[in-house]
Amino acid sequence: MIDKKNITIGIVAGEVSGDILGAGLIRALKIQYPQARFIGIAGKNMLAEGCKTLVDMEEIAVMGLVEVIKYLPRLLKIRRLVIDTMLAEKPDIFIGIDAPDFNLDIELKLKKQGIKTLHYVSPSVWAWRQKRIVKIAQATNLVLAFLPFEKAFYDRFNVPCRFVGHTMADIIDLQPDRQDACFQLNLEPKHRYVAILVGSREAEVQFLTPPFLQTAQLIKQRFPDVQFLVPLVNEKRRKQFEQIKAQIAPHLEVVFLDGQARQAMIVAEASLLASGTASLECMLCKSPMVVGYKMKPFTYFLAKRLVKTKYISLPNLLADDMLVPEMIQEDCTAEKLAEKLSVYLEQTESGIKNRQHLIQQFTQLHQLIRCNADKQAAQAVIDLLNDEV
């Protein structure tokens, strides 16, 4: 058993969802290693658990193939800083959380220097750029996956992988308490709400806010009693959203929330959101949703030719079925989004029945990935530290 007092763990998260996963993992590891040091790149959740960060996490949270090129010099400089720091610190293990294009190169270099490496959250190799499996095998001692079909993919290539479930599936109740969520947000439970979630990245807010606000205007015309909840991850994203709103929909009333996306989804009769981890969270909150996504045309041109899956949203990928509408690029228009969203808001008998059936399907998927992920992930780290993988 490794010395519990002097353990150092390198850990890098690249965006908000990874920061949440990292915080849960750190909490679980501190049960076994209460004196452990954590150093790397952290967001507010990991910082709250005592992780030291080398740079602001948002500096590496860029999206899209084209957008990365713009920030490449800075990204490379930060990556070099992480590698140099880790080689100097010589952590007992390095954990890269998601952000594969950033983390895998770090893991590869550290593993070559004899540092154990673990990648938490499988890159979407099953969806696109499948040849990355070779690099993943070279860069990591172990991959942790939160989707069952991901482990099956790794098993085909004999790459060590554990399915650990997803921490959000553990945290969120199978039957979320809407009354309590309304209380937390100081909202009237008898009112009708739609949640609008434009994403956590600058580019997502830029591309999705206009069509999402225009959708809200159309929904308001058709359902005047509906109120809109807009959770934003930080002050930067709120200012960005407000600037766009002033041009697109200055008179549309919305309730701004400081984070609190989960409570908003639980309260909402339906949600309009970006693809990504938010779609999984929305499913776990049992909120019927429409997924919209837009990016720069050239980024989309490249992505369309690289992606190998039928779906982009996690509920649909988990179910291997089109449970929720996906409106991508040219389909991500106010008219089309409003049409799909309206289905969930109709108070007809068939509408209510369809909604109940969807929530039942969401619950089944919730149970599938509810595995006490923090504990499972921490145990995987401990096993790797003790050469039991």
Swiss-Prot record:
Name the record gives this protein: Lipid-A-disaccharide synthase
GO biological process, one term: lipid A biosynthetic process
Record's catalysed reaction(s): a lipid X + a UDP-2-N,3-O-bis[(3R)-3-hydroxyacyl]-alpha-D-glucosamine = a lipid A disaccharide + UDP + H(+)
Superkingdom of the organism of origin: Bacteria
GO cellular component: membrane
Entry annotated with the keyword Translocase: no
Cited CDD domains: Glycosyltransferase_GTB-type (cd01635)
Swiss-Prot/TrEMBL keywords: Glycosyltransferase, Lipid A biosynthesis, Lipid biosynthesis, Lipid metabolism, Transferase
One Pfam family named in its UniProt record: LpxB
PANTHER family (UniProt xref): LIPID-A-DISACCHARIDE SYNTHASE, LIPID-A-DISACCHARIDE SYNTHASE, MITOCHONDRIAL-RELATED
Presence of the UniProt keyword Transferase in the record: yes
Listed EC numbers: 2.4.1.182
GO molecular function terms listed in the Swiss-Prot or TrEMBL record: lipid-A-disaccharide synthase activity; phospholipid binding
Involved pathway(s): Bacterial outer membrane biogenesis; LPS lipid A biosynthesis
Native organism: Histophilus somni (strain 129Pt)
Role, per record: Condensation of UDP-2,3-diacylglucosamine and 2,3-diacylglucosamine-1-phosphate to form lipid A disaccharide, a precursor of lipid A, a phosphorylated glycolipid that anchors the lipopolysaccharide to the outer membrane of the cell.
Gene: lpxB
Family membership: Belongs to the LpxB family.
